[in-house]
Amino acid sequence: MQRLINEIVERAKADRQRIVLPEGTEERTLKAANQILTDGVADLILLGNPDEINACATEWGLGNISKATIIDPENHPKKEEYAQLLCELRKKKGMTIEEARKLVVNPLYLGCLIIKNGDADGQLAGARNTTGDVLRPALQIIKTTPGITCVSGAMLLLTHAPEYGKNGILVMGDVAVTPVPDAEQLAQIAVCTARTAKSVVGMEPK
């Protein structure tokens, strides 16, 4: 199991991505970020008040947080640019520029806009926010893969029973997003989970 984690980490290092962490002062998030920066796994963008983030890093002895890019949503130099982008994306839903300007300071929305604008590759959140709050801006801004209409999540389950999955490794979907999927949604969840198993674990789904 540790071997799999090491393989995933090495692949991440070889294809280093820019990842946004909207919950910039959440303890588990910040400690994980410090480890990622220490190991050189990814380039991180922390969202939040810089003074508060740095104070938390000092309190918890996280010496490598200084390697992250820290962005204050209230004072982002691209705030107006992102507000215009959000307004354009949501204009068919009747969003005004004033509404967009209010949302763009929300770290979850800002993170998705940073990705949509090509300034980052991904976002990780949910330690402090609900699944619904995390997914809402992602669906409004980033949207789903073409051809996929059902949003789903996948979990990596590592067991000590080699007879299950691939040497005890199972990829499970969907356990949190779509509560009562119909037949078509189940089919899409199966396809997406199989893709995740292949790309993350190197498993040939059966």
Annotate each predicted stretch with a short phrase.
Residues M1-K206:
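Anion-binding alpha/beta catalytic cores of soluble intermediary-metabolism enzymes, centered on
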